[in-house]
UniProtKB/Swiss-Prot annotation:
One of its GO terms (biological process) is protein N-linked glycosylation. It comes from Betula pendula. The lineage of its organism: Eukaryota, Viridiplantae, Streptophyta, Embryophyta, Tracheophyta. This is Dolichyl-diphosphooligosaccharide--protein glycosyltransferase subunit DAD1. The chain crosses the membrane at residues 32-52, 56-76, 95-115. Its main location: endoplasmic reticulum.
Length: 115
């Protein structure tokens, strides 16, 4: 039974790899940006666990900045994806402008939180 589970897992990984190979390059760049933002948030959490969280506002601001940016990038990816039927009428330039404006608002709130 473990052998069939291993084969199923390998088949699943192979099918995911082949499906992702067909993804347009602009979506792959957004995916890379999301991975970078989440990785940066993880580094901040590990640093806080090792060193401590003396300026807790700074830690929360950095973490919320990374997570908020990743969420906004995922929203951008959903809107820019041509296969998504819900956002067919939305131009990619409009989606990017929304992303930039929301990022600006997010970071203004975070800077205000820092004090």
């Amino acid at each position: 039974m473990a052998r069939s589970t291993s084969k199923d897992a390998q088949a699943l990984i192979q099918s995911l790899r082949s499906a992702y190979a067909a993804t347009p390059s602009n979506l792959k760049i957004i995916d890379l940006y999301v991975v970078f933002a989440v990785f940066t948030a993880l580094i901040q959490v590990v640093y806080m666990a090792i060193v401590g969280s003396f300026p807790f506002n700074a830690f929360l601001s950095g973490l919320l900045s990374c997570i908020g940016t990743a969420v906004l990038a995922v929203c951008l990816r959903i809107q820019v994806n041509k296969e998504n039927k819900e956002f067919k009428d939305l131009a990619p330039e409009r989606a990017f402008a929304d992303f930039v404006l929301c990022n600006l608002v997010l970071h203004l709130v975070i800077m205000n939180f820092l004090g």
